[in-house]
Amino acid sequence: IIEHFGGMNMDLFGVPWAMNRFDELISLAKRDNIYLGLTAVSCMLADKKTGYDIAWEAVKRAASVIGYSKLIWGSDIPGTLRIYSYDELIEWIEKAPFISEAEKDLIFWKNGMAFFGENE
């Protein structure tokens, strides 16, 4: 699991090298055993003033290449809890108008179950 989309930041769509790095990261996630973690993406690619647009665009870009079955939710303890509560960390995925309920189920629990070899 490559957490935090590999450490992307707010410059993702404004800096060419950052986009190249992100595209390389997405390519890595095409491999069977590699997933991209979303837990702190809202902290890194969004803020309470500007909203979730950059974070959402990053998820759309990744999902268009690897699908929602390669995006996973993690715990991210304890770092991000200094900035956001768990409710706020989950909110940016819950409010994403382009992610279906079935895709949210993949992100929040089904992909984790598959990764760790658990059955439903």
Where are these regions (language model features)?
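Catalytic pocket-lining loop regions of alpha/beta-barrel enzymes
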Residues: I1-I72
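Bulky hydrophobic/aromatic packing residues
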Residues: N33-Y35, I77, L89
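Mid-to-C-terminal alpha-helical segments outside catalytic/metal-binding sites
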Residues: R61, V65-I72, L81-E120
